[in-house]
UniProtKB/Swiss-Prot annotation:
This is Beta-lactamase. The keyword Hydrolase applies. The lineage of its organism: Bacteria, Pseudomonadati, Pseudomonadota, Gammaproteobacteria, Enterobacterales. InterPro entries: Bact_CellWall_Synth/Modif, Beta-lactam-related, Beta-lactam/transpept-like, Beta-lactam_class-C_AS. Changing residue 168 to A: Lowers activity more than 6000-fold. One of its GO terms (biological process) is response to antibiotic. A beta-lactam binds at residues 80, 136, 166, 168, 334, 359. The keyword Hydrolase applies. It comes from Escherichia coli (strain K12). Pfam families: Beta-lactamase (PF00144). Belongs to the class-C beta-lactamase family. Class C beta-lactamase which confers resistance to penicillins and cephalosporins. Has benzylpenicillin- and cephaloridine-hydrolyzing activity. Has weak cefuroxime, cefotaxime, cefoxitin and oxacillin-hydrolyzing activities. Keywords: Antibiotic resistance, Hydrolase, Periplasm, Signal.
Amino acid sequence: MFKTTLCALLITASCSTFAAPQQINDIVHRTITPLIEQQKIPGMAVAVIYQGKPYYFTWGYADIAKKQPVTQQTLFELGSVSKTFTGVLGGDAIARGEIKLSDPTTKYWPELTAKQWNGITLLHLATYTAGGLPLQVPDEVKSSSDLLRFYQNWQPAWAPGTQRLYANSSIGLFGALAVKPSGLSFEQAMQTRVFQPLKLNHTWINVPPAEEKNYAWGYREGKAVHVSPGALDAEAYGVKSTIEDMARWVQSNLKPLDINEKTLQQGIQLAQSRYWQTGDMYQGLGWEMLDWPVNPDSIINGSDNKIALAARPVKAITPPTPAVRASWVHKTGATGGFGSYVAFIPEKELGIVMLANKNYPNPARVDAAWQILNALQ
């Protein structure tokens, strides 16, 4: 019964030239409510950007014990969706002339003297193609000297630029090195160059005391959790944000030419440029892209950790292809207690943000997002 109703509704919406707010509301609720029930998600916020305008939806609790509901001001941990901010901040540094993706890593960290670092560039770090850096920086890395020792001792499995292996230790180091010429800390650079110009006034790396009341608890095996500190966490998975700010983030990425700051405008475009291809996926800086129209099986199955975290051969795109408006641009993210997903289609001025205080399987997120955006495109 439910499937039949949903399919009919999707077909109706797809055929209309303009979806009224009530249609958007129906499509979102008919897709997300069963997802919340199936995945036992305590609280969720969704934004749909349709014809450039945001529509907001919230469900459940940010804090179960206090029965505090999710609102448009609730802060969620973004997990790896943070990498899209790191990619854009790196793009902004390129636009300012502070760094080049072709620069060797050692230019920005001369202490990195081990011979395996010869030939590894900032591009390799930003796009997980350095040769097999691990998914996580080890927990025992606490200090800058520990971090140097970790990278000095790392041994690549492949030559740089031949395989993509998704890694926090790769893009995290890119983020840390990309801001070095500015003289700013990573957090300062992100605040002044990305968050503030885009008026992301409730987006944080470190949640300030005044905002803690809005910071949702994540839930893992029934226990309330927040992300633990770790080396390069800010750069790889450390951003917390609201559904309103994340809708604004998608709007900015949909239409970068509307942004006044030229280097940020260029940074967004550079983050959506295509540097490598693996299968039908193109790797940007933080963002991942597929050609639109897209095969839903590609994005849904490709998001499964068995595929997303596996080593895959890459083909270099030289020179990189500038941002393609006919693209499905997306990124998944998770921490121990949160699961997020962002996807948008620039050509359609259409996008979605899904923030939840439970880490649930990526394919379920992508499937729901696809159903909603496909119905509205």
